[in-house]
Design a protein with these regions (language model features):
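Short structural boundary motif marking the start of a folded domain
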Residues: 2-8
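Glycine-rich beta-strand-centered segment in the early N-terminal region that forms part
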Residues: 25-39, 52-99, 107
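Short N-terminal binding/cap micro-motifs at the start of the first secondary-structure element
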Residues: 14-19, 43-44
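Cytochrome P450 core scaffold surrounding the K-helix E-X-X-R motif
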Residues: 44-50
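NAD(P)H dinucleotide-binding glycine-rich loop of Rossmann-like/cofactor-binding domains
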Residues: 16, 94-120
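Residue-level signal for short segments within beta-strands and strand-turn junctions
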Residues: 9-12, 50, 70, 102
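Generic structural detector for well-ordered beta-strands
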Residues: 21-23
């Protein structure tokens, strides 16, 4: 069953943020569901919300530096437990095997990194 989450949304480029909700998928075996307590809005979010970089996906929930508490973990998750306090940066996954990842530069993953915002 999808999870309804309150959010500040931008529906089109340049629109003001408005309160709403988004539907999230069920927690999968490798997922961690977090009750978000804080999310930062930085200038890259504003660029995205204004469609200044040409890659925006709408509707958009700006804010990609996140802090909260783990509500649920998938069956295969071993590093987090319900109740853990967590912080999430801009990138949440990469191949962890290519030259860039091994050098600690996951944002330049040669196989593609997973960002926390804008579906990219």
């Amino acid at each position: 069953m999808p999870i309804s989450t309150p959010a500040l949304l931008v529906h089109t480029a340049g629109q003001a943020f408005e309160r709403g909700s988004v539907e999230r998928r069920d927690v999968g075996p490798n997922d961690v569901l977090i009750d978000i307590a804080y999310a930062g809005i930085c200038h890259s979010d504003i660029h995205q919300a204004r469609e200044e970089w040409g890659r925006a996906i709408f509707p958009m929930v700006p804010g990609h530096e996140i802090a909260g508490i783990v509500r649920e973990v998938g069956a295969d998750v071993t590093k987090h437990a319900v109740g853990d306090r967590v912080g999430i940066g801009c990138f949440v996954d990469s191949c962890r095997e290519c030259e860039n990842c091994l050098a600690g530069e996951e944002q330049f993953c040669l196989k593609g990194s997973v960002a926390t915002y804008n579906g990219r």
